[in-house]
Amino acid sequence: MSVLQKPRGVKDWYGEELIYFNWTVHQITNLAWKWGFSEVKTPLLEYAEAFKRTNANADIVKKELYEFHDKSNRLLALRPEATAGIVRLVCENKLLQPQNYPLRLFTIGTMYRYERPQSNRYREHYQFSCEVIGDTNPTVLLDTLLLGHAIIQQLGIEGVILKLNNLGNSATIQQWNQALQAYLTQFKAQLTELSQSRLSTNPLRILDDKVDGQLPFISDAPQIEQFLDAEQQALNTWLQQQLTQQQVPFEWNPTLVRGLDYYTGVVFEFVKDDTTVLAGGVYDNLVEELGGTPTKALGFACGIERSINCLSAVKKQAILANQPPRLLVIGLTEAALEKLLQLSLGWRAYHPVTIYPKVIRIINGIRAAQRLGYRFLGVIGGNNLEQQTITVKDLATEQQTTYTWDEFRQRQVL
């Protein structure tokens, strides 16, 4: 019988990769708590309408959505992103109370997109998502951008640039779309089939296309600044001043758009080389579109796999070096092994203790510890039983120390 394989586009987590994963998640969620965010959990399954109502023209809905009818013929979908689910949670559970504004919520979990698997792009992938619901004033916006910057700094990812644009609002986006449609139609024959289809539905996405976005006539296309009012332009100026003062490397990109249809106002991406590590923006209409009252909101998502891939080799070495020390204990006799089982319950309050499951000689115990990745080896033999002691050997330095059982139980010795 052949070995069962995992589905294409998903990833197993184990060993060092899982250590990097847990470290990355801990760093990000710890910062979210420091910024005043509270954690929520939403289901992997939502009604497909939650995504189709808000992103009808987005690729993640038109091409990449995992959707199916259940046995009751209800159309469900695996979530491709977290924002719609969080907003649905807020609306359904009536969390939109003025005394709660703004809500600061975050979640972390798996997202699903049926796209061609490639480097650091998986059909099942992990995202950290945070949302501020109830206010998007300049201070809230800047504070959220600074959280994104702090995440990049905390992870030690170098060479990251914050790219921003201001889409204004629904009216300015519509005006920009119309102007782009009129301008790009004259170049329709030079566009790919995908971009030609977007001309009538969402021409903004042509600017973001990896192929057509590089065509020479794109640089002369209408830009959003032509349609922004004085207040929106003033926000752009203020943001750039504040980011400069905060020493956040940034670049104002007037052609930047996001792949999700619900974004309005400021959109942004933290980019390393050609990899977007963290991205988001303002979405002032989404809450109303999902059944709530008109409510301003903004948020961003950070890809965990991409973040891990951007960690330097030095950072990864430091993460591994800072893991809690692990101890393998062996019994040289049956009586010693039996005693270890009794003692280990108290010891584990202070030390991660793994018991080797059978009687073994010291030299073989050292080899087993090295093979299994343990730095410390604890030994109990006949003399240790009589003296009620354990000998602990540091395999990295080859130093060894003998402790009484009570000493080893009552204090941190590794």
From Swiss-Prot:
Q: Which GO terms describe its biological process?
A: histidyl-tRNA aminoacylation
In terms of one coarse class, where is the protein primarily found? Answer: cytoplasm
Cite the EC number.
6.1.1.21
**SUPFAM superfamilies associated with the record:** Class II aaRS ABD-related (SSF52954), Class II aaRS and biotin synthetases (SSF55681)
In which compartments does the protein localize? Cytoplasm
Q: Where are the transmembrane segments?
A: none
Q: Does the keyword ATP-binding apply?
A: yes
Alphabetized UniProt keyword annotations: Aminoacyl-tRNA synthetase, ATP-binding, Cytoplasm, Ligase, Nucleotide-binding, Protein biosynthesis
Q: Which domain of life is it from?
A: Bacteria
Query: GO MF annotations for this entry?
Result: ATP binding; histidine-tRNA ligase activity
For the keyword Nucleotide-binding, the answer is yes
GO cellular component annotations of the record: cytoplasm
Q: Which reaction does it catalyse?
A: tRNA(His) + L-histidine + ATP = L-histidyl-tRNA(His) + AMP + diphosphate + H(+)
| Subunit description | Homodimer.
Per the record, the similarity remark reads:
Belongs to the class-II aminoacyl-tRNA synthetase family.
Name the UniProt record assigns to this protein? Histidine--tRNA ligase
What is the organism lineage in this UniProt record?
Bacteria, Bacillati, Mycoplasmatota, Mycoplasmoidales, Mycoplasmoidaceae
Gene name for this UniProt entry: hisS
